[in-house]
Amino acid sequence: RSYGRMLGMVAHLAHDRAALQDLLGLLANKQLVLIDTTGVAPRDPRKDEILDLLDLPGVQKLLAVNAAGQGDALDDVMQAFKARGSSQAILTKVDEAVKLGPSVDTLIRHQMQLRGVTNGQRVPEDWERADAQQLVSASMRASTRSAFDPKALDLDFFFPPSSPSTMDSEV
């Protein structure tokens, strides 16, 4: 309800499918009705129950994707929710992402239609339309080196330079 007030909208609460159907009937003349659910992890047993509530005619599911998420975790989310009919996404927390590559890659590979991005905590000021060129460009540059980027000393330790004489003796 607090988000509704911040956006200048009336927020309603639906505890079950019947209540949601009733509300959607009352709001049928509205141009846009947003349904916000509790966030659930891909393997959360409540996921199917929550998504079943949204299996109603005319309801389009948008998946909120954390831009700061780790690549394999994002892939897991996409697989779980795309299987349940999600084909559109909002890329959130872009301002918190150290690297955008994993999230942009995951959206592209899963062919998700990106509807917008969020760049901060202020609603609705920090909402932006998705700009493919800007996102791809941002994902290709890193403002800082990662702690996981190899350093020359590390590479020399794990992969010592080989000399021709040591290679001959190993054969």
Language-model segments: residues:
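NTP-binding/hydrolysis catalytic cores, primarily Walker-type P-loop NTPases
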Residues: L107-V171
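Generic hydrophobic/aromatic pocket-lining and core-packing "Φ" positions
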Residues: L20, I50-L51, M78, S103-V104
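Switch II (G3) loop of P-loop NTPases
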Residues: G4-E49, D55
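A polyampholytic, Gly/Pro-enriched intrinsically disordered region
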Residues: V33-T37, K82, S86, L135-T144
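Conserved Switch II/interswitch segment of TRAFAC-class P-loop GTPases
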Residues: V40-D44, P57-L74, A97
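Conserved beta-strand/loop subsegment of P-loop NTPase cores
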Residues: G58-V65, K82-P124
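Phosphate-binding active sites in nucleotide-utilizing proteins
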Residues: R1
